[in-house]
């Protein structure tokens, strides 16, 4: 089952321990779950057997985060938003949605709770990120910011072909735009791009190479590897226009705000600090040694010892 964002990586499946924890308030640890000739299996027997498994550890973590964030931010996420996200995912899977849920060990309600918890954490992280919009952070973001650059790009799938095309575009009188349209292997045949340093329309390696060029400059072959398919692509870039960077960071305040918020909300360390503070505020304490380490990734600030035991 695909999750909504990187934040969702910590919220996988609500499995046996979560169910058992819900039941334990109604039954005694000595309650028989299974009976047989000469023996029984009690709630306590089952709990002791499964609690150290990876699935149980993840389930307990999910249950803790769900309870903590629902208590602190529950009114910030409506049932309507959860349903909309759920229905969007269901529509994407089509007729295979039920089987996808089943394979992930989820019920519809369990998945909705997962979505809700993810949204609650996302809200908390976004609110914390807004507090990072200080003048110092704006100035730091400005230092690393490059304004809009216009380029023509040739994408190729083979290195030898890319080297051959590079010779063509660097020949005297070569029409880069014409060659780009003829040679690019991009599925959409797009060759014209505009982007700043916060853009995502092209691989970072390609944008970095473009920023180093002067206007009308042509790059050497730039190779990139797709992190999903591990396929290597090759690019040749020509800069057709460059915007001069203004001296006052306030000229880019709105764009820099987007950059700061995006950097913070996608930073796993920042996310963990936000979660850590929420856990500390809730005074979460682990009473069963079997789960002693499940919150260790969030014990990143002083005073976090209560998250460990």
Swiss-Prot record:
A lipid is attached at residue 23 (S-diacylglycerol cysteine). The keyword Lipoprotein applies. The keyword Ribonucleoprotein does not apply. It is a lipid-anchor. It holds the Pfam family Rotamase_2. A lipid is attached at residue 23 (N-palmitoyl cysteine). Residues 146-241 form the PpiC domain. PROSITE patterns: PPIC_PPIASE_2 (PS50198), PROKAR_LIPOPROTEIN (PS51257). It is found in: Cell membrane. One of its GO terms (molecular function) is peptidyl-prolyl cis-trans isomerase activity. Its main location: membrane. Residues 1-22 form the signal peptide. GO terms for cellular component: plasma membrane. SUPFAM superfamilies: FKBP-like, Triger factor/SurA peptide-binding domain-like. Its EC number is 5.2.1.8. It catalyses: [protein]-peptidylproline (omega=180) = [protein]-peptidylproline (omega=0). One of its GO terms (biological process) is protein folding. Keywords: Cell membrane, Isomerase, Lipoprotein, Membrane, Palmitate, Rotamase, Signal. HAMAP family: Foldase_PrsA. Plays a major role in protein secretion by helping the post-translocational extracellular folding of several secreted proteins. Belongs to the PrsA family. This is Foldase protein PrsA. The lineage of its organism: Bacteria, Bacillati, Bacillota, Bacilli, Lactobacillales.
């Amino acid at each position: 089952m695909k999750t909504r964002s990187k934040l969702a990586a910590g919220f996988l499946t609500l499995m046996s321990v979560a169910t058992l924890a819900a039941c334990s308030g109604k039954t005694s640890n000595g309650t028989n779950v299974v009976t047989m000739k000469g023996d029984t299996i009690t709630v306590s027997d089952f709990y002791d057997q499964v609690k150290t498994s990876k699935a149980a550890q993840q389930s307990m973590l999910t249950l803790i985060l769900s309870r903590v964030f629902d208590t602190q931010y529950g009114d910030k996420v409506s049932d309507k938003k959860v349903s909309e996200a759920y229905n969007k995912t269901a529509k994407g899977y089509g007729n295979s949605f039920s089987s996808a849920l089943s394979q992930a060990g989820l019920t519809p309600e369990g998945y909705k709770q997962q979505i809700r918890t993810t949204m609650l954490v996302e809200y908390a992280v976004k609110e914390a990120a807004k507090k990072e919009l200080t003048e110092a952070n704006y100035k730091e973001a400005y230092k690393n910011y490059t304004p809009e650059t216009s380029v023509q790009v040739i994408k190729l799938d083979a290195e030898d072909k890319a080297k051959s095309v590079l010779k063509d575009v660097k020949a005297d009188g070569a029409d880069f735009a014409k060659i780009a349209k003829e040679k690019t292997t991009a599925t959409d045949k797009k060759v014209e791009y505009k982007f700043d340093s916060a853009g995502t329309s092209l691989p970072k390696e390609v944008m970095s190479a473009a920023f180093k060029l002067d206007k009308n400059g042509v790059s050497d072959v730039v190779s990139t590897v797709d992190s999903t398919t591990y396929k290597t692509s090759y690019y040749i870039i020509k800069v057709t226009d460059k915007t001069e960077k203004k001296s006052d960071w306030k000229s880019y305040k709105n764009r820099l705000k987007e950059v700061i918020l995006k950097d913070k909300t996608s930073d796993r360390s920042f996310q963990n600090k936000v979660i850590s503070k929420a856990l500390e505020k809730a005074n979460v304490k682990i009473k069963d040694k079997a789960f002693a380490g499940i919150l260790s990734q969030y014990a990143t600030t002083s005073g976090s010892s209560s998250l460990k035991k």
